[in-house]
Amino acid sequence: MQLTLERSGYATLNIDYQSRRGTLETLAENIRPAIELFVSGLSNSVHFVGHSMGGLLARVYLARYRPEQLGRVVMLGTPNGGSEIADRLKNISAYRAFFGPAGQQLGTQRDSAIAALFPPVDYPVGIIAGDRSIDPIASAFLPKPHDGRVSVANTRLDGMADHVVIATAHPWLMRNSLAIEQTIAFLRDGRFRR
């Protein structure tokens, strides 16, 4: 994804964040300096592309620190409506250890504090969902269609500008050539190609 975006003329910042070491609020604070430094060197629109929890992290970040020159946002396999897998596994110690505090915020039933992290979007958001699974165990917990981690229904978001479903599984969304093409189309045109 990053290389193709760069070849298409976009400057990129690929942030490696410690997703298991804090809440979404803490993670938003942690990525803030890198984003602010990157944005300070740009004169044009700043777009965000996030995969899975990265899309939720972008929403939390933008609710708190939205750059003036915000352009468009693309989310790939992001559990905007929560994750049924998180609902089932959140009380299991192995899940808590693997997904950390942010993993506890991924459920479909959100209390008012978690819901407050995700105010309505008022910027252009395009969402790419997958509808294939490579994980038969996770598939048992998810309503169809799904990508093996997130149901297509829970990728949707009130106020989104566009939504597209492609034939791939959750882990491959960021490397799928069609997902990459659709990401660039949305960043450029504000809509996906049909």
Set out the residue ranges of the language-model regions:
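Histidine-bearing beta->alpha loop at or near hydrolase active sites
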Residues: 17-22, 167-171
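Soluble non-cytosolic domains of exported or imported proteins
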Residues: 21-25, 174-177
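C-terminal catalytic-base region of ester-bond hydrolases, centering on the histidine
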Residues: 120-194
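Serine-dependent carboxylesterase/thioesterase catalytic core
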Residues: 2-8, 12-15, 24-122
